[in-house]
Regions:
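Flexible "arm" and connector segments at domain edges
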Residues: 1-126
């Protein structure tokens, strides 16, 4: 079955109860940002050591899940690029770090800049 990104996000959110995170929004976003960074790193590692398509697809699926959960939690939506704009595994990991940088701001008592956060999400999707 083929899903749109919106369908995937809603399906992932409906199943997220098994990954329920307590606390306030900042704590949930911090968890999701750490997960996104971790999975992007695992994807980059799988690519670099040649773990094969199955491992890479599994890690990329995990990246997609965390990105969907961040979108669900914030109400922001990533803008998906065309295939020829794909930054590669290291570019994706770098952009996941940009999302984490945005998410940690509220934990430091600073505002979460919606425009900057949107650009970071778009970067991970790219």
């Amino acid at each position: 079955m083929t899903m749109t990104w919106d369908e995937f996000r809603e399906e992932a959110a409906s199943r997220a109860g098994m990954h329920a995170i307590g606390g306030d929004v900042s704590a949930r976003l911090a968890y999701l940002a750490l997960g996104l960074c971790g999975e992007a790193g695992e994807y980059a590692h799988a690519q670099s050591v040649g773990d094969g398509d199955t491992a890479c697809i599994s890690e990329l699926g995990d990246v997609a899940w965390y990105l969907a959960m961040i979108e669900h939690a914030t109400g922001l939506r990533a803008t998906w690029p065309t295939t020829d704009e794909w930054p590669g595994p290291l570019g994706m990991a770098e952009r996941a770090g940009a999302v984490a940088e945005c998410v940690k701001r509220p934990m430091q008592g600073r505002d979460l800049p919606a425009e900057r956060f949107q650009l970071a999400l778009d970067g991970v999707a790219a």
